[in-house]
């Protein structure tokens, strides 16, 4: 019994400390059904940064990305104008729940990519990576700039 309690204590302590380690300012973690993946992100949180996004970049490392954050939930529409690399765009709500994943957006396209409504942000990562890692709608993210009172995975 003591061994079991010790094991549970260690497991819970590890899980909590591991989750908190994902709350550093430049890290965003995606929790999927069977795994978690940490991305090192740039933050686009003002109109100029959001307008420029990842335009004119010639490459993007796996597990790097850019997170776009908005002040209040809204309808998000993206495009790939002047973006030279294929991207996946992962749209999420204010709780950090992934609502839509657009896989393999075409470079330089001016086609509108509709994320949906009531969204607080989007994460752009290397094209087709979300499929390779098994991400799906309903998965969740942890990020230090989400409202802790609403986030499924808060940062404290």
Q: Model-predicted segments: where are they?
A:
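Compact, glycine-rich, soluble single-domain proteins
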Residues: 20-156
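Sec-dependent N-terminal signal peptides
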Residues: 4-13
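Cleavable N-terminal signal peptides
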Residues: 7-8, 18-20
């Amino acid at each position: 019994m003591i061994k079991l309690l010790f094991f549970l204590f260690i497991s819970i302590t590890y899980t909590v400390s591991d989750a908190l380690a994902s709350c550093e300012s430049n890290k965003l973690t995606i929790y999927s059904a069977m795994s978690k993946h940490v991305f090192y992100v740039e933050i686009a949180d003002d109109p100029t940064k959001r307008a420029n996004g990842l335009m004119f970049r010639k490459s993007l490392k796996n597990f790097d990305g850019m997170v776009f954050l908005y002040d209040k939930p809204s309808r998000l529409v993206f495009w790939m104008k002047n973006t030279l690399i294929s991207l996946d765009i992962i749209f999420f709500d204010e709780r950090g729940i992934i609502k839509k994943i657009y896989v393999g957006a075409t470079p330089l396209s001016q086609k509108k990519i509709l994320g949906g409504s009531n969204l607080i942000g989007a994460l752009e990562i290397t094209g087709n990576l979300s499929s390779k890692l098994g991400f799906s709608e309903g998965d969740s993210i942890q990020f230090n700039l989400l409202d802790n009172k609403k986030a499924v995975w808060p940062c404290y």
